[in-house]
Amino acid sequence: MSKNYLNQRNKVEDFLFKSKFDYENQPINRLKKVEIIENKQELLKKLKLKIENLEDCELKNNANKIVFSDGNKDSSVMIIGEGPGQKEDELGKPFVGDAGILLNKMLAAINLDRKDIYITNVVNYRPPSNRKPETKEIKRYSEYLYEHVEIINPKMIILLGS
């Protein structure tokens, strides 16, 4: 017999009762996200610094300010826009131009206040001439966006833009 064959029951027993589930004489930490919750502000600062320190970034070279985020970092709702426009680039906050006025009206229509929502963009610098972010730009910023979502850990994500 060159191979041991395990039936389904043996697989379950191996999975449930082998050494990886042996417990030591100490409590089990089931709250793995506590560290993230406690340090959310610090993690957001580090993420923003990472984005600000990007090198060889055409978007960064053409923009005035980083447009990182706005709103409640503890919100269960996160809005992700496509990219900042001219007004956002001037003020360094997402959705403060015409799109922001429309967003505020839409939120009010469903009894939500902007200050209770967390808002960011796919790319954090304004594309030249208010054009849509290109695929390569979106890919470059996607790792930062994933990290951003992980830090905020919303229950709902609303995507805006084209």
Task: Describe each region flagged by the PLM.
Residues 1-21:
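Non-catalytic accessory regions outside enzyme or core folds
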